[in-house]
Every structure is written in structure tokens, then in C-alpha cells.
Design a protein with these regions (language model features):
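Short hydrophobic core segments
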Residues: 15-16, 110, 132-144, 179-182, ...
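Short beta-strand to alpha-helix junction loop
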Residues: 74-93, 105, 182, 254-263, ...
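Alpha/beta-hydrolase fold catalytic core
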Residues: 261-334
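Rossmann-like dinucleotide-binding core of oxidoreductases
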Residues: 3-10, 14-20, 24-45, 139-276, ...
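Feature captures the FAD/FMN-dependent oxidoreductase FAD-binding
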Residues: 79-145, 319
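C-terminal active-site-capping segments
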Residues: 405, 409-507
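Glycine/threonine-rich phosphate-binding loop and adjacent beta-strand/alpha-helix elements that clamp
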Residues: 337, 341-416
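Beta1-alpha1 glycine-rich phosphate/pyrophosphate-binding loop at the start
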Residues: 5-15, 20-104, 206-207, 273-279
């Protein structure tokens, strides 16, 4: 991968993160004629979440046709639901086909971002590297960037092998080992079926069971791939059918409606069909409404739990000990390895990178009680900065890529206004942002996410800064164009000429 020099002058845009969002933003900016752009990636390769999540069984629980960009469809998906390796290949293909590689700088960990009001640009500090200046910044690092270990007493005393699902140790040999899996969320239900095939014993520690629906993962026939490649409109139609199918599910998982009951009936029928033991069925039956937590899509998890070498443990964990896990009833379970399938540190309070805006405002302080933004993308007081998958942009029923693509197109339009309109700053008005968030919270109060269960969607005091309370079509429609009246736009002063950065590729 070639390198480039971004030290001289000011870039039109800096993109933080080279995952799905960062690569997609760079592509759309390039398509719009904005090429004075750098992507700063702390890792050594593109891919973000799909580069990091390489655990056994890692796959997407959204159909591949929908978990991809409409502007770069892939007719060659091998299955209805793709594995992590195939998704990562898709991201690499986008980088090659749109020649984005020369804009990426790896090993660039952004540690601080500060707005320079006089100059009208952002000052981006990079750990151990020269600083970068940019007229606009796109925060594309995403909410699933930092693995989260559980806050369990004694976790540092355990002497065996510890593995987080998002930082999988491929050198560790599970064969013949006694293994614990802590967590029963989206990654755990994919890991457990693979571990029971090779480990001596697997014990799954469950805090609360989730609603689990069947996932029918069919292999895509060669003829179908050829048809999609030759007639792209047929793949567009397939994507549309998947989209509207998922859109209808919103009625059952976003709000409590008669369709919620149907979703729960499907979940219970799936459980009854796959689990014969009444005691185990009771332990796996959720005690909250479908949709309150993320739905789990799998047809392999329940059968894996019933393998002779697998045990479900429902007693709460009291502490980790040097040899294993002790539960509250006093039993100590000894293990060679513990797998923490405990998700990510989702920044719905604070920010993963320190950001200082106008008048020395610190975004982490403003978000300490719950993150708020305008349409999930812009924050008042932080001009020319845009977020992908910012506050209240999470889908509970559809593809993240549908939401992300709408965000990217909106952000590209906003950046074009700044760059081509030669603006000093575009800052969303505080009154507009406040009105938007008041409306969000009113609508969220009526959703299943705020119906009483504990989930990573909510802060400790119950504030929902994560999910969008509506259909995907509603989210996309609100981003169909930048309403310039919602922003304070200031022209750049003619007496402050700024030389653009030299983005020069090095072979």
C-alpha cells in the first residue's frame, strides 16, 4: 500500500477510520470531485469491525444483499448471510476498484482533535506522527471499535488464557481444553457452535437469554451469481425485497404492536423445535419483550448447547479466581481458557477520541450524560465535523449499511458546501439540534428499547443515545439533503489564504 505526505497545508477532509464507513465516505467524496482527502487508520489494514472480528463462526446476521452499498453491489456473495472473511474481501475490493488505497495512512492513531477558529480548520494530533490540518473531519471510527471486557471482580487474577471475541487468538489451540464462554449475545451464539466441535468441554455463562430467531443460510447458486452480474437490476430488485421485508419487521421490534406478539411466537416456536428439555427451555426463554435487546439470528446455537460437552450456567458470576470462575452459589468452575463474548465499549456517553470545539468546548463533557447530535451527524459548536453512526442512528431491524450510506451521502453534500462554497465553517444551530433531540427522546419513550430491560442501547440512567426510533425509510429520508437553514454558515475570510495540503503518493 502506498504512502503519502499530508504535512504541508490543509486537507479538504480527514476521515478517521478505514472501515466500512471510512472507505465508503472516501469513495463518495472522490465521486464528487473532492480528492484532497486522507484516511487515518490506527490499525495495519482496512476493514474495521470485520478486520478485528475473526472469531470462529463470525458472520453477519443481515442478508449480504442488504449488508453492502447500493453503489457497489457484489453479485458474487456465496451465501445469504456472509462470513467475516467474505465481507472483508468486499471492503478490500472497494479499495482496489475505486483506487482509495493511496489515501489511507495506516498506523495513524488519532489522539486529539481541536478546532482552530481563526484558521477555520481542525488540528488533528496523531500518536508519534506529524499533526494534520483539515477543513473538515469525518469521524468514521464507528461504535464497535473498542473491545469491552466485563467489570467482573478478580478478572486480573485469572491465570489461564483470556480471549476477547473481537481480539481472537488464532494461535491458541482449543483442542482438548476446558473452555468458558462469558456472554450470550450476537458473537457468543456464533462462537459456541464452533467451540463445541473442538474443545473438551464448553460452559456458557448466561446472564439473560435473548430472543432468538432462525437463520436460514442458503448457498447462492452459480446461475444466480451469473444473473446478478449480467443483469444488475435483478440484484437491485433482490436487495429491495430484502429491504422491505426487514422494514416490515420494525412494526414488531421497534414498537410494541400485535406484530411483536408474532415475533415472540416465532422465537418460542424456534426454541420448542430445537430444545426438547423443559428445564433448558425455561432457562433460554426471555423475560422481556422482543426487540428490547438485539434479536439473535441463529439456527446453530440451541443445538450446540445440547451437545454432551456443553453446559449452560445461569448462576451469576461472583468473581474470577486464579483457576476459573466462581458463581454466587459458591461453585468454582475451572478452565484452561475463558472467552469473553461481551461486546464493545459503545460510546453513548463521551467520545473515543478527545474533541475540542469552539470556545474550548469538550465533546466528551457535553456527552457525559448521553450523546446528542443533529440527525446523528453534526453537533453544534463543532463546525465542519461529521459523524457516521453517531448518536441515535442504530437500526433495530435493518442493515447498518442502509443507514450508513444515507449518512455518507449527506456528509459528502455538507463537505461539498464547505469546500466548493469556500466556507470558513458550517455549524448546526443549537436550537435546531435541541429540537431534534427532544423529538427523538419523545419517540424513543414509546419504543420497546425503553420498555424496561437492561441493554447496551441505554446508559446507566436509562438514556437512549443509540437507536433511531423509526423505520429505515424515515431515517434515510431525513438525510436526503442538507437543509442549509439549519446551519450557521460563515464564508472564509479572503485575507486568510490557505495553501491546500500536498497529498503525494509514494511508491
Amino acid at each position: 500500500m502506498s504512502e503519502f505526505d499530508v504535512r504541508e497545508g490543509v486537507l479538504d477532509a480527514v476521515i478517521v477510520g478505514a472501515g466500512f464507513a471510512g472507505i465508503g465516505t472516501a469513495i463518495r467524496l472522490r465521486n464528487s470531485g473532492i480528492e484532497n482527502v486522507a484516511i487515518l487508520e490506527r490499525g495495519s489494514a482496512v476493514g474495521g469491525t470485520w478486520r478485528d472480528n475473526t472469531y470462529p463462526g463470525a458472520a453477519c446476521d443481515i442478508p449480504s444483499r442488504l449488508y453492502s452499498y447500493s453503489f457497489t453491489p457484489n453479485p458474487h456473495w456465496s451465501h445469504t448471510y456472509s462470513g467475516s472473511g467474505e465481507i472483508l474481501d468486499y471492503i478490500h475490493t472497494m479499495v482496489r476498484e475505486f483506487d482509495i488505497g493511496s489515501r489511507i495512512r495506516f498506523g495513524h492513531n488519532v489522539v486529539d482533535i481541536i478546532w482552530n477558529e481563526g484558521a477555520g480548520h481542525w488540528h488533528v494530533s496523531i500518536d508519534g506522527r506529524p499533526d494534520v490540518r483539515a477543513r473538515t473531519v469525518v469521524m468514521a471510527s464507528g461504535p464497535l471499535a473498542n473491545a469491552s471486557l466485563p467489570n467482573i471482580r478478580g478478572i486480573d487474577t485469572y491465570e489461564g488464557h483470556k480471549i476477547h471475541s473481537a481480539r481472537w487468538d488464532h494461535d491458541y489451540d482449543f483442542e482438548g481444553k476446558k473452555v468458558a464462554v462469558v456472554g450470550t449475545g450476537a458473537s457468543a451464539v456464533q462462537i459456541v457452535p464452533e467451540l463445541v466441535k473442538i474443545a473438551d468441554t464448553v460452559k456458557v455463562f448466561q446472564r439473560t437469554p435473548g430472543w432468538t430467531l432462525p437463520r436460514i443460510n442458503r448457498k447462492v447458486q452459480a446461475g444466480t451469481k451469473r444473473r446478478y452480474a449480467r443483469y444488475p437490476q435483478t440484484q437491485t430488485l433482490a436487495r429491495s425485497l430484502w429491504f422491505w421485508g426487514h422494514e416490515s419487521v420494525a412494526l414488531g421490534v421497534v414498537w410494541k404492536t400485535p406484530l411483536t406478539r408474532i415475533v415472540e411466537l416465532v422465537g418460542r416456536a424456534h426454541l420448542r423445535q430445537q430444545v426438547r428439555d423443559p428445564w433448558l427451555r425455561r432457562q433460554l426463554t426471555p423475560r422481556f419483550r422482543a426487540g428490547c435487546k438485539r434479536l439473535l439470528m441463529t439456527s446453530d446455537y440451541y443445538p450446540a448447547l445440547q451437545k454432551p460437552n456443553c453446559t449452560l450456567v445461569t448462576w451469576p458470576i461472583a468473581t474470577l479466581s486464579p483457576k476459573g470462575i466462581r458463581t454466587v452459589e459458591g461453585v468454582e468452575h475451572q478452565f484452561d481458557a475463558i472467552v469473553f463474548a461481551t461486546g464493545f465499549d459503545v460510546s453513548n456517553t463521551g467520545t473515543p477520541i478527545p474533541i475540542t470545539g469552539r470556545d474550548s468546548r469538550v465533546l466528551a463533557d457535553e456527552w457525559s450524560a448521553g450523546a446528542k447530535a443533529y440527525k446523528s451527524i453534526a453537533v453544534s459548536g463543532y463546525p465542519n465535523m461529521f459523524f457516521t453512526f453517531g448518536p441515535n442512528s442504530g437500526p433495530g431491524h435493518s442493515s447498518a449499511l442502509v443507514y450508513m450510506e444515507a449518512q455518507i451521502d449527506y456528509i459528502v453534500e455538507a463537505i461539498s458546501l464547505v469546500v466548493e462554497g469556500d466556507l470558513h465553517s458550517a455549524d448546526v444551530r443549537q436550537d435546531v439540534q435541541d429540537a431534534y433531540n427532544e423529538d427523538m427522546q419523545r419517540k424513543l419513550a414509546k419504543t420497546t428499547w425503553n420498555s424496561g430491560c437492561s441493554s447496551w442501547y441505554l446508559t446507566e440512567d436509562g438514556f437512549n443515545a443509540t437507536m433511531f426510533p423509526g423505520f429505515a425509510t424515515q431515517y434515510v429520508n431525513q438525510l436526503r439533503g442538507v437543509e442549509q437553514g439549519d446551519f450557521t454558515m460563515v464564508p472564509r475570510r479572503v485575507d486568510l489564504p490557505q495553501e491546500p495540503a500536498q497529498v503525494v503518493a509514494h511508491s
